[in-house]
Amino acid sequence: MTVTEGIHALAKWLESEVCPHIKLKVPSNERQTAAYDYQLANPSVHKMYAPPAKLAQQVNREICPGILVHLVNGRDMPRESARDLRFRLLLSVWNPGLHAEDAGADAAPFEANADGWNDVWNFMDLLLQRLRNAEQIGEVLRVKAEEGFDYKPYQEDGAIIDFYPFYFAELEFSCAMAQAPPSKYYAEEYL
């Protein structure tokens, strides 16, 4: 199994096992106006890098809400024909405040607040629950739940950054691959 197979397997698993189970607000160009009518969508999954906004629109996928799949590092153990991969998942949500649809018919059309952080942590709780229950991801990865799951708000230089009305959190965990590619044949066959 290759590193790219691991990244693709995790992204596919997130798209089928996590994202369909939550709907979050989609950013709009008409933010915080009385006529504001927000949309809900399932998060999208992006591998390694978030696409530029125009490219995401062309393929009809939102960047936010979303999950960005990063490979943090890997470790091969050739004598055991094994490979470990450490992943970071960056969750992104957008929520500028309370909309009438959220609060009921008698509510104001829009009331700005900073409670959108609840959305990113509810998203994280769903993801953690799914990972705890997953033994295998596709036929490629085994979740190493015994090593635990590390999560935190997104930070830069050790400080939590305020990107209101966007909220971010990250999760790191490890997976094992069934077998690393045999090195002496791999280059001849695949490269």
PLM regions with names:
Residues 1-80, 186-191:
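Small/polar-rich, solvent-exposed N-terminal microdomains that initiate assembly or binding
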Residues 81-100, 104-110, 127, 162-179:
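Oligomerization/assembly interface segments of phage tail-like spikes and tubes
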Residues 104-115, 185-191:
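Short intrinsically disordered coil segments
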Residues 15-28, 93-104, 151:
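Short regulatory "switch" loops immediately downstream of catalytic or recognition motifs
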Residues 4, 11, 164-191:
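C-terminal tail/extension regions appended to the core domain(s) of diverse proteins
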Residues 17-25, 134, 138, 180:
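Solvent-exposed amphipathic alpha-helical surface segments
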Residues 114-178:
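Acidic-leaning, charged glycine-interspersed low-complexity segments
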